[in-house]
Amino acid sequence: MNEWLNVAPELLALLIFVSRVIDVSLGTFRTIVIFRGYKALAAFIGFFEIMIWLVAAGQVFKNLDQWYLALAYAGGFSMGNYVGMWIENRFAIGNELVRCLSFNRDVLAEKIREQGFKVISFDGDMGTDKLVELLFIVEKRRNVPALIKLIKELDASAVYSVSDVKSVYEGPEPLPRRLFFR
């Protein structure tokens, strides 16, 4: 390996950079799937992550006199974090809870249900004469942007928040799911 390194050291720097981008991206993605409860997937990803890391780190430690390899290593780490978050965002793994406060009672929940979303609604008041409806909607992350868009279209005055859900129990007979390509 040292023969071609002497001829093209910038190629080794590029390989180290790319290796770090891959292994840190995998690590970022692995960490996120751990928090979402996918233990087996995290273990599978972790195997490849550490194998790539060993190769990249080994080359840097073997050639400590070549400072640009350390720069490639650090640059790959930095870029890998960004790429890992981008990948996780594209996969949109898991569920999210959308809490929505609507001032137009008995309208928003029904219209959202008509679009195939499962909605739990509660009547409430804000301590004044103003009555409100509180909606809870647990939905796949990839469907949440469409749900938020629908809420904004149906009730521009609605207030909502979105939070991650680690696990969901749908009961012995799960309710029918919304089709993804609908």
From Swiss-Prot:
Pfam families: DUF2179 (PF10035), DUF5698 (PF18955). The chain crosses the membrane at residues 7-27, 41-61, 67-87. Disulfide bonds: none annotated. InterPro entries: DUF2179, DUF5698, UPF0316. It is found in: Cell membrane. HAMAP family: UPF0316. This is UPF0316 protein Sde_0566. It comes from Saccharophagus degradans (strain 2-40 / ATCC 43961 / DSM 17024).
